[in-house]
């Protein structure tokens, strides 16, 4: 079996990613990329990719730079995969990483590699007739508790209404993030207070403060201390992603677990988060960190360092399925993130959407990712 074609498909939603002062559900991603790898036997592997999709497409479609063996360093990612055996995921990951190293190593090139790696694992599962978690090494659980992942609303009443909406669906944990949070402490605290009161003491509240609001470590510490009375399970993304020493300063000063990592890439990057950053919870996004090939290494690294892993998963059911496989593979797992946005790129891409059951998501058991892409929907929203 050989790889016959590799492509990034660019999708556009008719709506715009937004948030307002109302309790209404945010629209979700405006643009999304899909990685599609087709083999000469007809097997197809898929992954979504939450990045600047046209740039990722350029990384994949770029030509081969040199015909000289061993000189791959500016090559388009497709040229590095076509004709190769898709089952050799570890070797192909490094082939893409080295072959793009002069324009890659991190950023959009690594994100494209991540999506292609997930698609290769999807092919492997379909070839062997096994779900990805079995190929990773095993399944420790059949289901994972999900938290509703959404944006901060603009006022306490809207926060209360939003929480009531999620708990009525069966969620036992809700994470609010971004939106207008972080601009004014006197405005922020009533939002967190409203969420906690609506959730009650038996459900979990998670807070994503949004690092786009630039803070010093001491400002971050003050923020965590201010919301600690509302018992957040964790506080996420307080500082710039590369501020490892600042994260250690915060993590050592507060009692609330500190989470970050959705912007991080490669196992080397997560080693920095553990050793320099000292964070409590790692949040690798499989479409950014390096795919399953790197995600498995992050899980092993976290287990050795006694850290939790809660993958970032905010796009479509494709990434949710991938994250469930990685979470099933962990010996200890607390949560999986569930993007509650109602836009078509979040909700319509697969024929068998992942459904909440009593606050949990079931780990897919079908071959590969265990979800089936609806190619009619892909064509409907495809722009490149």
Task: Walk through the language-model features, giving the residues of each.
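Structured beta-strand/loop patches that form or line metal/cofactor-binding pockets in enzymes
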Residues: 1-46, 50, 54-57, 342-347
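Hydrophobic faces of well-ordered beta-strands that scaffold small-molecule active sites
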Residues: 47, 146-149, 172-176, 205-209, ...
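Metal- or metallocofactor-binding catalytic centers and their adjacent structured scaffolds
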Residues: 38-127
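Metal-dependent enolase-superfamily TIM-barrel catalytic cores that perform enediolate-based chemistry
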Residues: 137, 142-254
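Shared catalytic-loop signature of beta/alpha-barrel
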Residues: 225, 231, 242-360
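Conserved, mostly hydrophobic/aromatic
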Residues: 3, 42, 77, 116, ...
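Flexible C-terminal active-site loop/helix
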Residues: 1-4, 9-11, 15, 32, ...
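Glycine-rich, aromatic-flanked loop segments that form ligand/cofactor-binding clefts
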Residues: 108, 117-153
């Amino acid at each position: 079996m050989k790889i016959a074609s590799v492509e990034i498909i660019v999708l556009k939603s008719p709506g715009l990613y937004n948030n307002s002062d109302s309790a209404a559900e945010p629209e979700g991603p405006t643009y999304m990329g899909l990685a599609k790898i087709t083999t000469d036997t007809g097997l197809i592997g898929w992954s979504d990719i939450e990045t600047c999709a046209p740039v990722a497409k350029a990384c994949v479609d770029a030509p081969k730079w040199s015909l000289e063996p061993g000189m791959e360093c500016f090559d388009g990612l497709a040229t590095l995969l076509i004709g190769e055996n898709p089952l050799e995921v570890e070797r192909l990951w490094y082939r893409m990483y080295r072959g793009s190293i002069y324009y890659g190593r991190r950023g959009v090139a690594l994100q494209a590699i991540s999506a292609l790696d997930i698609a290769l694992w999807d092919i492997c599962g379909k070839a062997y007739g096994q779900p990805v978690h079995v190929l990773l090494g095993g399944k420790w659980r059949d289901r994972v508790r999900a938290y509703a992942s959404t944006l901060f609303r603009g006022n306490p009443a809207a926060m209360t209404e939003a929480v009531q909406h999620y708990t009525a669906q069966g969620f036992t944990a809700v994470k609010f993030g971004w939106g207008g949070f972080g601009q004014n402490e006197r405005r922020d605290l009533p939002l967190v207070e409203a969420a906690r009161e609506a959730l009650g003491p038996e459900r979990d509240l998670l807070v994503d403060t949004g690092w786009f609001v630039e803070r010093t470590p001491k400002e971050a510490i003050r923020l965590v201390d201010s919301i600690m009375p509302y018992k957040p399970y964790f506080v996420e993304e307080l500082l710039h992603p590369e501020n490892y020493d600042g994260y250690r300063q915060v993590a050592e000063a507060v009692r609330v677990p500190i989470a970050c990592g959705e912007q991080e890439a490669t196992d080397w990057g997560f080693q920095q988060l553990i050793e320099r950053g000292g964070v409590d919870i790692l949040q690798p996004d499989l479409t950014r960190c390096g795919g399953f090939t790197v995600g498995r290494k992050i899980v092993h690294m976290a287990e050795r360092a006694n850290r939790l892993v809660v993958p970032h998963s905010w796009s479509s059911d494709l990434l949710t399925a991938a994250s469930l496989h990685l979470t099933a593979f962990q010996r200890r797992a607390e949560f999986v993130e569930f993007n509650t946005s109602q836009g078509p790129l979040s909700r319509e891409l697969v024929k068998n959407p992942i459904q909440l059951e009593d606050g949990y998501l079931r780990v897919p058991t079908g071959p590969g990712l265990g979800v089936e892409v609806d190619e009619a929907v892909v064509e409907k929203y495809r722009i490149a």
